[in-house]
């Protein structure tokens, strides 16, 4: 009599095991879907469309320039101003760049009997030349340039009619100039760029001494500007 009872118990257990998955599936199907508490996060890359295929760009920065206002002057001048530059790209790597820069400030003066101390001085550059796009990716780039042109030096504004040689200054003049350096660019979007521009600034001024004799002087100084560049949407 024990065998039938055991078989009956075994059959009951098997029936429960078979029915359990079916009940679980039914409960799972009947449960309504739950919506997420927060919306789905979508990442957007602001630099995804940086391709370096623009035709034009324009940059403006706050500028610094070190210079000497005279050939034998011991004290240098630290000038501040603006750097406005633009480029026309002929290909991916080569372009033509033009730059206009204005630097103003004061300078030390040579010993004199006219009580002239710290007079105003200024340099205004207008140069153009070749530009080369070096290593670059969507985050930034390195660009080199070599530009040539002229500079107007304003040295006599505060001399009150005193000859510039009295304070070891150059006279007011337009002189040959060159700017060689480049740009360090950090892309902020497809069109906007944070730009740092360090340069070597070369000038070739003429000075006149008390006897009227003239001589030319070749100077190399450091300049840097920090600002923003805008790349126009027009493509090559």
Describe the predicted segments one by one.
Residues 1-11:
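Bacterial N-terminal signal peptides that target proteins for export
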